Amino acid sequence: MTVLERLDRVGKKLLATGNGRCNLTNRNAAPEHYHSADTARLADILERTPPDAVLDFFGEMGLLCDTQADGRVYPYCYQASMVLDVLRAALERAGVDVACSCGVAEVEKGPGGFSVRTRDGRAFSAARVVLAAGGQAGPQFGTDGSAFALARMLGHSVAEPYPCLVPLRCAGFPVGLKGVRANCALSLYLDGRCAGTERGEVQFAEYGLSGIPAMQLSCLLGPGVKKAGTSVDFFPEMAFPVLRGMLEQRCASGMFASLETLLLGLVAKKLGHAILKSCGLQPLSRAPGSLSRREVNALASALKNWRFAVEGTLPWTQAQVTGGGVPLAEVKT
């Protein structure tokens, strides 16, 4: 058995997984947690290789693991470098040859097996070939998308790749929100229809939205999407009439001297000011009691449905995974 590694050392990208901690698997792995049109094939794969099988695989190599409350599994030492060391040691014990700086240029299937030619002219032959070259996400770690050309050589079709688990670029995004975080519900609209909603901590940036909810929804932004937008609900567990009533009470209470403090205790200060401005509620020195019912209604609407047009995502360097590629239906299980 021989491993052909295009880079000068194996496992370079592995060191970056899980923010350097290496998320090995998830105890809650299930088809509904994946983005795929072929859920039947996905279910079959997960049934054949459940999380316990993954943990047994690493356990047999001597790696002790730790499972978090949300089901994520990491090496007990929480160091990706340890996972790489364990894998390299297993290769050595099994007598596997590893050829680094050995990028593959061509692969061809013939009557007697496969022939492989590298970029520097070396030739290899094998009864079986495993193409495990990754996609295009994180090119700074060595991935360049060249594996898709090899897949085509073997007769596979390749759907147009696109960045996934990546922050969203939003048009007309308010300035000054960089670094602000909020627990909320984030929805993605594609061509006017809600394509998905994720709840959790959203991070506001100078370009748009980040955080787990935004990155999860980015997987729905495939090629061909003509119009996309987001909706931020800062109070997903509170019905609109209840929120509006609370705002009306705050305006009438006299507790808040100006709009500058009206949303104090509800959302972050910078966020509150940006929302008020988006509703045209200026200046901030204005007395809350002067707001009309229509203006209070507009403010409540913004807190429940703050909308932004999505221009796209950040580039491949910020993406964690690749969408598209070889269809799951063409992968034998």
Which role does the model predict for each range below?
Residues 3-5, 67, 98-100, 131, ...:
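General beta-strand structural signal in soluble alpha/beta enzymes
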Residues 8-10, 15-16, 24-31, 64, ...:
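An anion/pyrophosphate-binding glycine-rich loop and adjacent beta-alpha core
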Residues 6-97, 102:
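Conserved N-terminal/central alpha/beta ligand/cofactor-binding core
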Residues 100, 273-333:
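A glycine-rich dinucleotide-binding beta-alpha-beta segment and adjacent secondary-structure elements
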Residues 2-4, 104, 123-143, 151-152, ...:
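Short hydrophobic core segments
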Residues 100-113:
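A conserved short coil-to-beta-strand element within the FAD-binding core of flavoproteins
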Residues 119-121, 193:
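Glycine-centered tight beta-turn/hairpin loop motif at sheet-sheet or coil-to-beta transitions
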